[in-house]
Amino acid sequence: GLDYARLYRLGGYGYAGIPDKGHLDPYPSDSGITVMDMRTKEIRTLVSVKQVAEFGVSNISSAAHHYLTHLSLNPASSRIAFLHRYFMPDGGLMTRLMTIGTDGSELRCLAQGFLSHYDWQDDSHIYIYGRSGSTVDAMRNNPIMSNPIIKCSLRLAKKVIKSVIGKQRGIVGGMSFLMVEDSMRANISAFAKELIPSDGHPMTHPNMRDWCVCDNYPDLEGCRDLFLFNLIQLKRIDIGRYRRLFETPDMSLKEIYFDGVDKKILASISEEQLAFTRSGLHCDLHPRWSANGKWAVFDSIHEGTRQIYKVDVSDIL
């Protein structure tokens, strides 16, 4: 499990109303990934935020608050993947893809950069959307970027870039899905740049590990795509398109929506966007599989309310 109080404060989502006990500590030793014995209900810490933050770095800034998110077991349940995130000097987020044994051994950092959603393909390979090891990310992570003058210039530049990116749909900033080997010296290779040009929420088929189900974010028409993808043949099969809601959130409730959220999160997103996300109007498809792999199951709000849907894909695979 994760520290959802810390995740809510720093990640912008989680469980509201639970105070982060480590809100003054940039990398607490009593917060991290926990394991619970389902029989005895005993809870122990597998790895702390402090251990992860200190791993593989020569020095660590006390100005950056760190947190862990997006846990995922490999098929053999022998290793756990997760994302380590912290705020860079320019206000952006740095993400590290990490793995650790379920016994707490062999902590590894596989990739670092702008990294998003992922899943295990097999016991030793993870595919994740983003970019890793770029010069741009290395520059942004430099302490000099905390200089007020430089931060102001960067803020303006980022607004221009986001404006341009928002008007087009395609491969952004050298990002794509990356196949990452879970080893001490991870091999990383990009794939499917043209077939999957934007971020989504992939999940590998439980029985046929070459296949995954995935989605993407709304296009200019407000529609999300649901599709299957073969990771070996690099073959995409679209299943459907589902429209988002264009309603606006009740901004009179913004104090409720924003309560307990870190100021850096509030500075990185508009009030309207964050309120839309918190109001329940935002609904990613988040596709996943039924246990037998026959059904692709997803969330959607295209009929006006949040519902769970399923599609029989057994005749396709």
Model-derived segments and spans:
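Sequence signature of WD/YWTD-type beta-propeller architectures
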Residues: 1-317
